[in-house]
């Protein structure tokens, strides 16, 4: 709760409340954000499917779903879209995988090699 309040105070000080999304894999953190700072956009970082990422994202009012790339299927992406989620995938470092996920229609990629992603995805 203390961390959430610190984030909220900093965001207010710098007039960033409407420009940030706090992401976490912790349901405790997402719960605290929901309770203490509902005006801050939230995102779920999902690494496993044993807790349905779409259900958890909905439960905590998330607007973003950051999926481990291995969890990103066309079906899951379509369901996330219907739920109104921005879908980001991580960590995507191989050009062929970047292209495949972009072709699926993900909203963003998280990579250790941004220049590689730009050159890969700018090619027709």
Indicate residue ranges for each PLM-predicted region.
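Short loop-to-alpha-helix "cap/lid" segments that border enzyme active sites
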Residues: 1-124
């Amino acid at each position: 709760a203390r961390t959430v309040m610190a984030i909220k105070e900093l965001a207010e000080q710098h007039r960033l409340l409407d420009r940030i999304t706090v992401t976490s894999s912790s349901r405790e953190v997402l719960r605290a954000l929901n309770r203490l700072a509902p005006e801050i956009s939230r995102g779920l970082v999902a690494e496993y499917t044993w807790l349905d990422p779409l259900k958890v994202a909905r439960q905590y009012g998330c607007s973003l779903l950051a999926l481990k790339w291995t969890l990103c299927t066309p079906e899951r992406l379509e369901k996330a879209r219907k739920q109104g989620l921005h879908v980001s995938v991580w960590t995507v470092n191989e050009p062929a995988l970047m292209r495949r996920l972009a072709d699926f229609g993900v909203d963003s990629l998280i990579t250790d090699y941004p220049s590689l992603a730009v050159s890969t995805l700018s090619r027709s």
